[in-house]
């Protein structure tokens, strides 16, 4: 069976979480200025969102491997420089899927679109959150990206 590697751009990974004790992963962090850090203290998830996303994935696909990039830091905020750098890093790895559980609501420049298209042409599935309100969500609205949207089911 082919191993599946999922790249996650989010708030990092709680390496002490029981789900990841036997999971193969690589990790780094990208600062808002685009600098990369391999220090565990920098990619450790202090927010919980990235760990929650990875936990959902591993629950559905137990043999998955990860390349985790903390592009949000402790503040839970990021910028386009960090996101684009994270995508460039993942482009140079062996990921099969890239998960971005966030949306940018202001139209970015062409570089983000170009990166997503290039990843798609390289047979890498790129998935991103589509916001649940009016307006466009980037990069989910690009044709080369699978937009994922949550919602409430009536009577549940």
Segments (PLM) and residue ranges:
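Active-site core segment of subtilase-fold serine proteases
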Residues: 1-56, 60, 64
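Subtilisin-like peptidase catalytic core
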Residues: 39-104
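Active-site donor-binding loop signature of nucleotide-sugar glycosyltransferases
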Residues: 30, 71, 150
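Proline-centered loop/turn at the N-terminus of a beta-strand
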Residues: 5, 65, 123-127
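Catalytic-core segments of hydrolase enzymes
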Residues: 95-156
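Conserved beta-strand scaffold positions in the cores of enzyme catalytic domains, especially
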Residues: 25-27, 66-68, 145-147
């Amino acid at each position: 069976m082919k191993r599946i590697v999922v790249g996650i751009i989010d708030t990092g990974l709680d390496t002490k979480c029981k789900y990841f004790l036997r999971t193969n992963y690589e990790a780094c962090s990208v600062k808002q200025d685009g600098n990369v850090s391999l220090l565990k203290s920098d990619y450790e998830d202090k927010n919980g969102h990235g760990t929650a996303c990875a936990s959902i994935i591993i629950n559905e696909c137990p043999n998955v491997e990860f390349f985790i990039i903390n592009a949000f830091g402790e503040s839970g905020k990021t910028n386009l420089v960090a996101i684009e750098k994270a995508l460039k890093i993942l482009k140079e790895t062996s990921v099969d899927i890239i998960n971005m559980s966030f949306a940018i609501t202001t139209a970015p420049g062409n570089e983000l679109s170009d990166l997503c298209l290039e990843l798609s042409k390289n047979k890498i599935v790129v998935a991103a959150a589509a916001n649940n309100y009016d307006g466009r969500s980037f990069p989910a609205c690009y044709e080369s990206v699978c937009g994922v949207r949550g919602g409430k089911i009536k009577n549940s």
